[in-house]
Regions:
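Single conserved hydrophobic/aromatic residue that forms the stacking wall/gate
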Residues: 1-9
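Alpha-helix C-terminal capping/helix-to-coil transition sites in glycosyltransferase folds
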Residues: 4, 77, 83, 195-196
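Short, basic/aromatic recognition patches
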Residues: 14-34
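Residue-level signal for inorganic ion chemistry
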Residues: 22, 40, 87, 127, ...
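Short loop/turn motifs at secondary-structure junctions and domain boundaries
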Residues: 31-35, 44-45, 156-158
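Short beta-strand scaffold segments in enzyme catalytic cores
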Residues: 38-47, 164-166
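Zn2+-dependent cytidine deaminase-like catalytic core
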Residues: 43-142
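Active-site ligand-binding patch in enzyme domains
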Residues: 106, 152-153, 158, 162-207
Length: 207
């Protein structure tokens, strides 16, 4: 591999690593951000992480705002890695694009466009018009998996439902000896899914 190609490969690998961290940050806050999607953000300068941010509890502030607020260094010409397209409109918070432009961030990577029509695809143009390099689609499949429930809810106007059923190998739900057939591993998964959900529906007997 030539030096030029090697440098390109190294940059691409670093970009993926930074975005993986952003995705991990988003996943850690998933289910705790109200109606807003959980977003992760990493800011890098000279190949060094200088700040991170997540969507706040109940959805505010946004991850980009938190990452900028958390940073004590000059953000000029830094790179921002964010899991979802930054917002570009005024709502309960100012546009993240405005904050990015104001702080002279030089390059923005995001995994995928937001499904919200107020945002979708518009941030790309806004940032480019302000001389900020923009690249989208980095680790898009991972982001699609992370935002499956959010996109389903916005597109279908329906709740995203996860069903959990425990059965034994012989397809019996429980025996007279013991009603519990799950182990500690499956119990941990169940509690994790409950943590990431907005509501839980159970039978009266479960209580």
């Amino acid at each position: 591999m030539s030096r030029g190609l090697g440098d390109v490969y190294k940059r691409q690998t670093q970009d993926k690593d930074f975005m993986k961290l952003a995705l991990n940050l988003a996943n850690a806050r998933r289910g705790l951000t109200g109606n807003n999607p959980s977003v992760g953000c990493v800011i890098v300068k000279n190949n060094r992480i200088i700040s991170i941010g997540q969507t706040g509890y109940n959805g505010r502030p946004h991850a980009e705002h938190n990452a900028i607020l958390n940073c004590s260094e000059n953000l000029k010409d830094s790179k921002m890695y964010v899991t979802l397209e930054p917002c570009n409109h005024y709502g309960k918070t100012p546009p993240c694009t405005k904050n990015i432009i104001k702080n002279k961030i030089g390059e923005v990577y995001y995994s995928m466009d937001d499904i919200d029509l107020k945002v979708k695809g518009k941030s790309y143009s806004i940032l480019r018009e302000n001389n900020i390099r923009v690249k989208k689609g980095l680790l898009k499949k991972d982001a699609e998996n992370l935002y499956r429930s959010y996109f389903f809810n916005r597109k279908k106007k329906l709740p995203y439902v996860i069903g959990k059923i425990a059965v034994s190998k012989n397809m019996i739900i429980y025996s007279e000896i013991s009603k519990r057939i799950t182990d500690k591993t499956s119990d941990k998964l169940t509690h994790y899914l409950r943590l990431k959900s907005d509501g839980i529906m159970i039978s009266g007997k479960t209580l």
